[in-house]
Structures are given as C-alpha cells and as structure tokens.
Amino acid sequence: MKVNGVEVEETFAEAFDIKIARVLITGYDYYWAWVAANEATGFGTSVIMCPAEAGIEIKAKPSETPDGRPGYYIQICHMSKKGLEEQLLARLGQCVLTAPTTAVFNGLPDAEEKFDTGFKLKFFADGYEKEVEVGGRKCWAVPMMEGDFIIENDIGYTNGIAGGNFFIMAETQPSALAAAKAAVDAISDVEGVITPFPGGIVASGSKVGANKYKFLKASTNEKFAPSIRDQVEGTQIPEGVKAVYEIVINGLNADAIKEATRVGILAATKIPGVVKITAGNYGGKLGKHIINLNELF
C-alpha cells in the first residue's frame, strides 16, 4: 500500500493496557499553562525506567475550561492504580502547585474511577484551605504567596492503551527527523492521545528483553538500526535508508490511537526523502491491542 507515494507496509502495531489519568491545567495565559504542563509530564517517556509515562495532550480554549482561562490537557499513565495515584499526587504537587497562576481540574469528569488528589493537596494550606465551586465543580482554594491555588477535589482515570506506534524510514537523518516532527505536529491536534517521548519522537527504538544481556528489560532493536544493517540477520532496513524514527502513541481508547496514527502517517509521507512506513510488533509479548496500518486508509 502507498500513501502519498510512500510505501506503508501491511503490518500492525502492538499496544498494551495502561491506566491513564487526564488532567486539565489552566493558567494566566497559554505560556504559563504550558510551563506547568511541561513540568508535570517530565521524565515520562517509558515505563521501562520512568516512574510513569506522561505527555501534553491538547490545548483547551478559555471557553472550554471551568475557570474561563486557557489551558492544556495532560495525561499521566501507569501500569497500576496505586502507582498512578502516587504519580498524580507527586507531579501535581511538585510541578503544578508550585507553578505561577495555575489551576487544576479533572480532565475526565465522566470517569467512573477517580482519585481524591485535590482533597489530599489541600492540606498544603495547613488549615487555611477553603472549599469553593468553580464552573460547577467542587474545588479547593489553597492560599499561597501569589494568591489562591485552585484544584478540583477529584481527578478521573480510565483504562487506556499505550504503545501504539509507527516507524518512519528515510534516506537521511534530516529528512527522517522532519517527517517525524511533521507527524507529531499533526498528532498534537488529535484529542485523547499523547506522544510521550522527547519531542514526541523515539530515536532509540527497543525490543522486549535482550539477546545477549539477559538482565535488560529492553534493548536496541537491531533490526531497525541502519548503521549495522550488514551485520544483522533479518534486518528490516531497506537499501538506501540511513535513519529511522519511531512515533509512540498512548491514548484513552483505540479509536483515538488509530486516528493519531493515520494523521501522523499522512503528515510524515509528505516529506521528501521518506522511503517507507512500518510499525513495531513483538509476537504478542507486549500487548493485546492490534492496530493494522492498512485499515487506517
């Protein structure tokens, strides 16, 4: 199959279950909302070594937020309920409570499952906290140096999906990078998904476990490493490909990940020098969710 003249391999991405909390952070303007969102989602690329996977999802217009201010939705992802609650409390407490002009609201108001994160963080007020209503939501006002920090009592979470992916293969590193950035930019407009790696792009595509070093949880995916193409039996690098980037997508549901994959591939294949698009799957070792690339177009 070809998209914009570029071969898209008839294969699938293999994704896995994860729990996702969705948070709305608002601020005085988009800059300060972004600062807090960016801090709160740091060190969140992969559960292989990070305490959570996290990323900025999408902008929120002032007309869409409980306090009428601009904001960003973020997602924090963890394999366990306990771990997710701990990460939510730590990241909101250390990275958003501390940031200028921010407020925090539940990004999944209809979720059946919630954490009382706002209730817990209100104790920072040391007895001066006050229950308030903002946009019809139960919140807490925490007096601080700049004024009151507002946080909603509950933050919702859901069973989501992590590890949706596709690979961009190109003739040069600059063309691969330009295509990957174009893909991430397109995906940033899709509601319900994040691309948790640096700039949304994975340079170090990995496989589950390792062939030589058995103590590793993950190791380089040598079949996708152009510099050792001639040394690797079963290499997946076509002739003429000098660089590969992977886009990893987490989302609230499969439909959101599929749409993000679709628009990402459409954007990437418009960049000159892109040779092929494929995806990563691991023989069922990683997860049960299958995203067939050929079904997206």
From Swiss-Prot:
GO terms for cellular component: cytoplasm. The keyword Acyltransferase applies. GO terms for biological process: lactate metabolic process; one-carbon metabolic process. It comes from the Archaea. It catalyses: N-formylmethanofuran + 5,6,7,8-tetrahydromethanopterin + H(+) = N(5)-formyl-5,6,7,8-tetrahydromethanopterin + methanofuran. Its EC number is 2.3.1.101. Gene3D superfamilies: 3.30.70.520. This is Formylmethanofuran--tetrahydromethanopterin formyltransferase. Belongs to the FTR family. InterPro entries: ForMFR_H4MPT_ForTrfase (IPR014053), ForMFR_H4MPT_ForTrfase_C (IPR002770), ForMFR_H4MPT_ForTrfase_fd-like (IPR023447), ForMFR_H4MPT_ForTrfase_N (IPR022667). Its main location: cytoplasm. GO terms for molecular function: formylmethanofuran-tetrahydromethanopterin N-formyltransferase activity. It is found in: Cytoplasm. Keywords: Acyltransferase, Cytoplasm, One-carbon metabolism, Transferase. Homotetramer. It comes from Archaeoglobus fulgidus (strain ATCC 49558 / DSM 4304 / JCM 9628 / NBRC 100126 / VC-16). Pathway: Metabolic intermediate metabolism; lactate oxidation. Catalyzes the transfer of a formyl group from 5-formyl tetrahydromethanopterin (5-formyl-H(4)MPT) to methanofuran (MFR) to produce formylmethanofuran (formyl-MFR) and tetrahydromethanopterin (H(4)MPT).
